[in-house]
């Protein structure tokens, strides 16, 4: 069995590659000629050099594979067009390549995002997979367009969509900034309301993704994967302080107006950088929402999904890795 993985040189994709290797698959990874293979070093993978924008390279890369796991995508971009090129068109190209040169494909697993749906309206009513999608940002809209392409292929390919919430874990550079700030004695909480969010450790995510890819029940379906409880940032901060053995941490509550102002300034100065800003106005919109929560009941019912780590085990494991690798 051959599993083809996009985005394997990155944070989540490298863990996906490891998970499918553990399950006995031959793993083939799409990489650019210039991609860093830091997280794939020493792994017995096949490397397919190509790009999601190069249809001929994709057709060659997926030829004869059994499973495709599409992880690659843009989380930061200069404009709406870049998001749609990276997330929507790239997915469309990969689906067409799979249709053309992977006739025995058993699963096309697409990693999407909770941002496709927009935030839940209340803590008592987390978002369900069947709810109408109301993305708030160009990123969310581009991921929704990618999902639409996947769903359009349901009669042609055995597709499954996984919607992930905020993801943390070893190798992550995004939520790392939060852990670093707490290690330096500062915890910044956004707003004065009791925000809740779905969260998942990368190892729980990739285990759930692989289980979904191997289950006949999940063909044509969409699932949220996350820890079962919803967390507050106060809870996350408390677990982080304990893991860091940091007692004296200054907690700052940042008004939404300040957050949005900083986001706007970051976006402005990002226009003069060679890379798109990680924090921009649309990211600010995401950050000030109260309930980024999705129900995992469908995943539990259909293929027995259950997170094993939770923040009580996942955060200490992550921080230990950061320390061992001199990030903290």
Task: Show the residue positions of the predicted features.
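N-terminal Rossmann NAD(P)H-binding glycine-rich loop of SDR-like oxidoreductase domains
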Residues: 3-23
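NAD(P)H-binding glycine-rich loop region in Rossmannoid oxidoreductase-like domains
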Residues: 36-41, 45-89, 99, 117-119
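Conserved Rossmann-fold NAD(P)-dependent oxidoreductase catalytic core, especially the SDR/UDP-sugar
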Residues: 93-138, 160
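Flexible, glycine-rich beta-alpha linker
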Residues: 117, 160-177
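Active-site Tyr-X1-5-Lys
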Residues: 134-160
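Substrate-positioning beta->alpha
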Residues: 145-146, 172-177, 190-213, 220-224, ...
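Mid/C-terminal beta-alpha module of Rossmann-like enzyme folds, strongest
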Residues: 211, 215-279, 296, 312, ...
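Amphipathic terminal alpha-helices
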Residues: 297-302, 306, 310-328
